[in-house]
């Protein structure tokens, strides 16, 4: 089967980003993103941003706050220049508390770097109650029909 244009770039980008993050190499992380990179966070629209410099600022803070941060790409799938990735980030914050985030990031890849992403990576909430409690909190306590 012939690889479609962009697939190799997309896969290589995810590998570079994971490796740079695990090495805590800020410059290598930033190099994975286009200068005009666009980050959309559909579940939190106010958190979206544009630009590689915000990527630098975010990762500089993350790496300083979680000195043992490690990342894993749990799964990925790609189609041409788009790659769907499932991530897990874990480590220990400076105050000793555990850091654990899981979720999906969908990347658009151009020229071997991330041009855009739809970001769904969230902190894991342990012991937050079961599904029934969650549904009630989200939609109210009306009676089921």
Describe the function of each predicted region.
Residues 46-57:
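Short beta-edge strand/loop motif at the mouth of beta-sheet-based domains
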Residues 6-9, 18-21, 47:
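Alpha-helix N-cap/loop-to-helix boundary motif
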């Amino acid at each position: 089967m012939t690889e479609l244009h962009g697939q190799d770039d997309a896969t290589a980008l995810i590998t570079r980003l994971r490796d740079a993050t695990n090495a805590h190499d800020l410059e290598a992380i930033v190099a994975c993103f286009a200068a005009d990179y666009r980050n959309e966070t559909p579940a939190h629209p106010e958190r979206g941003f544009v630009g590689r410099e915000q990527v630098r600022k975010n990762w500089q803070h993350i790496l300083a706050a979680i000195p043992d941060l490690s990342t894993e790409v749990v799964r990925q799938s790609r189609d041409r220049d788009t790659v769907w990735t499932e991530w897990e980030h874990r480590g220990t914050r400076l105050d000793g508390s555990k850091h654990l985030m899981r979720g999906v990031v969908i990347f658009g890849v151009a020229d071997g770097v991330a041009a855009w992403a739809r970001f769904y990576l969230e902190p894991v909430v342990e012991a937050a109650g079961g599904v029934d409690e969650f549904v009630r909190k989200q939609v109210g306590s009306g009676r089921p029909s």
